[in-house]
Structure formats: structure tokens, C-alpha cells
């Protein structure tokens, strides 16, 4: 269950901005996983992959402020939330390009909680221009995750991606692909979610990635198969990954975005000559304390698209109306209803997410 607790406001530290939250967005799959894990005796509930090793081995020098590194919360409770928008109320002295009063969007499961006030490192914060609704900007983390997954396919203009899963990320992926001139085929066992997709460039909506679905993929790709597949579902079934092998063209790429069964059919994999890659969260820099906590950027000539630049691009696409959030069904509810909202989302296939509100906003809500 989700519990709201009173906590002291965070203390502003070097490299951080203090933000008064106006909207935060629920990521149903990730957050339910964390909530469920708190009920397991002895379990550590966190979003980080191998936190003890991952953060320590990124750089030999380590972070200059180790107290900022995320720690797995104890059993019983876990802070959740990682995508929000709000107004800056204070900045650390070393922050030069963000000022109090600026409107920003923030990411990070170690800091951008469902909370009235958060302290977020500069590299996990992006400016939001006038004209972009705060509740749309609050999806910045989900947008960056979808952008990074799309990049990992390596697809370019005119190619075709099979997207398995028509949830929030799948919906965003279809819109991003269209904005990039890439065609999509979407598979989901939930017909309601397939009907919610309204991006142009969707060649086919498939109720399953079964034999008929795989045949349909080949039919709309001149018999070759999809250039890439993004698996954006949570399931224990191995049929998803093995079906994706059958749906790919020779030499295609599969991007593992969700959590799914990994008992691979070697014959299918070998026959497809497929490349299987992961997509790590919001982009390069994620889980790197030097980047995220010490705010040391990756030079653009070394890494064109970091997690912060992916976040900023999502906000830009919102401002240019290339991404439409109005058509994505979500609940818009006060934070005080969090527990009931998590339960409602779990049983409602037509609602992809929830936006928590925190009183007054710049839209006058």
C-alpha cells in the first residue's frame, strides 16, 4: 500500500535546486514493483540496478559528496516517484543557469519523489518554457526513457519498429517514432490500449504477437520483418522475446525496456541474427554519481545525448506540439488520494497513469 508521511523539507546542498512540486507523475509498473517489494521480509526496495556495486565502480575516484548517493531504504517503507514539475524556490550558490521562480521538470528516483518539496541535482533538472502545461512537463522522466529506448534501436527515417506494449511508454514511443519519421507496429493483448493510440505512422495494431501477429508484421514490411523491436511490457512469459525474434528482419535489433522472460530460443535468435540490447533509464549519465550528484556533464562531442539532454528534448517536443499528452488517459488527483489511486490504476486498463497535484499551479489549478 502507499502511505503519505510527514517529512522535514530537504536540506539544499551543493549542486542542487529546491523545487516546490506542482505535479508528479506515477509510473505504474516501476512504482508498483517497489511498493510490492516492501512487503517482502528482508527485501531492499529500490530502482537501482545492483546499487552497492553500480555506484561504487562507475569511477575510481567516486563521488565527491558520498552522502548524496542513494541508499536502499529499509524494509517497510520506500520513497517513490521519479518524475515531476514545479517552481524553483532556492538554488545552491554554484548553480548559475537556474534561478528561484523558474519553472522546471525534474527526474530521478533518488530525489524526484511524490513530495511537496524536493532537492534535485542540476543534471536532473530542465527548464520548462511558458506554454508547456506543468502536468505535461511532469512526464519528463517517462519521456526521456522512451526517447532513450528509441535511440537504442538505431533506426532512422523510413524504418519500422515493432513496439510490444501499448502502455504509457508504448504510447509515447509511437509518437516519438512518428516525429522521427519512423513507422511503428504495436502489439498488446489489451484492446483498449491499442484503441487509445492515435499517433500517425502506425502500420498495424496487433492483439498478440502470435503466429498471426508475426505474419502481419512481415506483410506490412514487404516480407522482410521489422527493423527493430522495443519490448515495453512486464511479463514472465518467454513468448514475447522469442516472438520478437520471428518478427524481425535478419540483423534486426531488440531493445529490452520492460521486464520479461528471458529463456531465449537459440534457434530463433540465431536465425534472426538479432542484436539484443538494453535501454538504461533516461540515458547516458544515469546511475553515474559523478554525472548525477556532482553535476559533471559528459561533453557533447563525446556523448551527444545524455539523460539531461534527453529530458530537455522531451520538453522541447512538448513545446512544439510534436508530442500530445492530452490524448493519453490519466487520472488527475490530489496527492492525498495516493493509496486509492495506486489501487485504481492497477485495475483499470483504460487509464495509463496518474498525475498527482499539489495545490496551486501556474495554470491556476
List PLM regions with ranges.
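Residue-level recognition of short, solvent-exposed, well-ordered loop/turn junctions
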Residues: 13, 27, 99-100, 121, ...
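C-terminal capping/lid region of NAD(P)-dependent oxidoreductase domains
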Residues: 223, 228, 255-258, 274, ...
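Mid-domain Rossmann-like dinucleotide-binding core that forms the NAD(H)/NADP(H) cofactor-binding site
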Residues: 110, 133-211
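C-terminal substrate-binding/catalytic core of Rossmann-like NAD(P)-dependent dehydrogenases/reductases
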Residues: 264-328
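Glycine-rich beta-strand-centered segment in the early N-terminal region that forms part
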Residues: 10-25, 37-108
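Residue-level marker of beta-strand positions
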Residues: 23, 102-103, 117, 160, ...
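A structural motif shared across PLP-dependent enzymes of the aminotransferase-like
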Residues: 108-121
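Glycine-rich cofactor phosphate-binding loops and adjacent beta1-alpha1 units
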Residues: 153-155, 195, 200, 204-279
Amino acid at each position: 500500500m502507499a502511505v503519505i508521511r510527514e517529512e522535514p523539507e530537504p536540506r539544499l546542498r551543493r549542486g542542487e535546486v529546491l523545487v516546490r512540486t506542482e505535479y508528479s507523475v506515477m509510473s505504474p509498473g516501476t512504482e508498483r514493483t517497489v511498493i510490492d517489494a516492501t512487503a517482502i521480509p528482508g527485501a531492499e526496495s529500490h530502482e537501482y540496478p545492483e546499487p552497492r556495486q553500480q555506484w561504487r565502480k562507475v569511477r575510481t575516484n567516486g563521488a565527491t559528496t558520498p552522502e548524496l548517493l542513494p541508499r536502499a531504504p529499509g524494509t517497510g517503507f520506500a520513497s517513490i516517484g521519479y518524475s515531476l514539475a514545479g517552481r524553483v524556490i532556492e538554488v545552491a550558490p554554484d548553480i548559475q543557469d537556474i534561478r528561484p521562480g523558474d519553472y522546471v521538470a525534474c527526474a530521478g528516483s533518488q530525489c524526484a519523489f511524490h513530495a511537496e518539496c524536493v532537492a534535485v541535482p542540476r543534471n536532473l533538472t530542465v527548464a520548462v518554457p511558458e506554454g508547456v502545461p506543468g502536468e505535461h512537463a511532469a512526464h519528463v522522466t517517462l519521456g526521456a526513457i522512451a526517447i532513450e529506448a528509441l535511440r537504442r534501436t538505431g533506426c532512422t527515417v523510413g524504418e519500422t519498429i515493432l513496439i510490444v506494449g501499448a502502455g504509457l511508454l508504448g504510447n509515447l514511443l509511437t509518437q516519438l517514432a512518428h516525429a522521427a519519421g519512423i513507422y511503428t507496429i504495436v502489439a498488446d493483448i489489451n484492446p483498449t490500449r491499442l484503441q487509445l493510440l492515435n499517433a500517425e505512422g502506425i502500420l498495424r495494431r496487433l492483439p498478440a504477437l502470435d503466429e498471426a501477429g508475426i505474419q502481419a508484421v512481415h506483410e506490412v514490411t514487404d516480407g522482410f520483418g521489422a527493423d527493430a523491436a522495443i519490448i515495453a511490457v512486464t511479463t514472465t512469459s518467454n513468448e514475447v522475446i522469442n516472438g520478437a525474434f520471428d518478427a524481425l528482419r535478419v540483423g534486426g535489433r531488440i531493445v529490452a525496456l520492460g521486464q520479461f522472460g528471458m529463456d531465449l530460443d537459440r534457434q530463433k535468435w540465431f536465425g534472426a541474427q538479432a542484436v539484443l540490447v538494453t535501454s538504461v533509464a533516461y540515458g547516458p549519465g544515469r546511475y553515474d554519481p559523478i554525472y548525477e550528484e556532482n553535476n559533471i556533464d559528459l561533453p557533447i562531442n563525446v556523448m551527444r545525448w545524455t539523460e539531461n539532454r534527453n529530458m530537455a528534448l522531451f520538453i522541447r517536443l512538448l513545446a512544439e506540439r510534436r508530442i500530445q499528452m492530452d490524448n493519453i488517459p490519466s487520472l488527475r488527483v490530489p496527492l492525498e488520494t495516493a493509496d486509492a489511486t495506486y489501487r485504481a490504476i492497477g485495475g483499470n486498463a483504460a487509464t495509463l497513469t496518474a498525475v498527482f497535484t499539489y495545490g496551486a499551479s501556474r495554470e491556476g489549478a
